């Protein structure tokens, strides 16, 4: 297993395609899954079951938001976002929390 902390997300994708071992994205410009995992584990530790709860993200629509929205949606949480208009989220990112895999 290889943990990759890279700038470009395409680097992680290329590594996964070219290697025989699993590649874990530790951080890229598109995603920060370990931060999302730490956030939801902390929320779960403090609040218990997260199903039906809401999480508010205030900031710019970046890799941290993207990963938190996906993780929160997977756990059945409602995601709310607020931030400056010049750093607002895309429609695709807005819909991430609606994806229940």
Enumerate the language-model features and the residues they cover.
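Structural motif
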Residues: 1, 21-24, 54-56, 78-80
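Glycine-rich NAD(P)-binding loop of Rossmann-like domains
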Residues: 40-65
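Conserved anion/nucleotide-ligand pocket segment
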Residues: 57-86
